[in-house]
C-alpha cells in the first residue's frame, strides 16, 4: 500500500507518497527534500519528528522510550507509514531539551 505522508518542515509543508515498506526519510529524499539525519539506523535523535496525525511502524528503532513514542515522537529514518500520516520534522532540539 502507498500512503500520503505530510511533512511539516520549518520551510513549509510537503506531501509525499510513501509505500508501507519504505522508510519515510528515504521517500522524502527521493522527492528532493533535505531532512536531517545521522545514523540512519534508528539509534540517535538527528532525524526525530513528531506525528501529529496518523501512525507509523518504527519497531526497528532503539533510541526512543515507549513514553516518547506514545507522545508521538518518531525517527523518520526507520519509520514506515501505516496509513496517511502527518509529521513535524526538525524536532531533535525539542526532543532532547
Swiss-Prot record:
Binds 1 [2Fe-2S] cluster. [2Fe-2S] cluster binds at residues 39, 44, 47, 77. Gene3D superfamilies: 3.10.20.30. NCBIfam families: fdx_plant. GO terms for cellular component: chloroplast stroma. Its cofactor is [2Fe-2S] cluster. GO terms for biological process: electron transport chain. Keywords: 2Fe-2S, Chloroplast, Electron transport, Iron, Iron-sulfur, Metal-binding, Plastid, Transport. GO terms for molecular function: 2 iron, 2 sulfur cluster binding; electron transfer activity; metal ion binding. Belongs to the 2Fe2S plant-type ferredoxin family. The keyword Electron transport applies. The keyword Electron transport applies. It is found in: Plastid, Chloroplast. Its main location: plastid. CDD domains: fer2. This is Ferredoxin-2. Pfam families: Fer2 (PF00111). Residues 3-93 form the 2Fe-2S ferredoxin-type domain.
Amino acid at each position: 500500500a502507498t500512503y500520503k505522508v505530510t511533512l511539516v518542515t520549518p520551510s513549509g509543508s510537503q506531501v509525499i507518497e510513501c509505500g508501507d515498506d519504505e522508510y519515510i526519510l528515504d521517500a522524502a529524499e527521493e522527492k528532493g527534500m533535505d531532512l536531517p539525519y545521522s545514523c540512519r539506523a534508528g539509534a540517535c535523535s538527528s532525524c526525530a519528528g513528531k506525528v501529529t496525525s496518523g501512525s507509523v511502524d518504527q519497531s526497528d528503532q532503539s533510541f526512543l522510550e515507549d513514553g516518547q513514542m506514545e507522545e508521538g515522537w518518531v525517527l523518520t529514518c526507520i519509520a514506515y507509514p501505516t496509513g496517511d500520516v502527518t509529521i513535524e520534522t526538525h524536532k531533535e532540539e525539542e526532543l532532547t531539551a
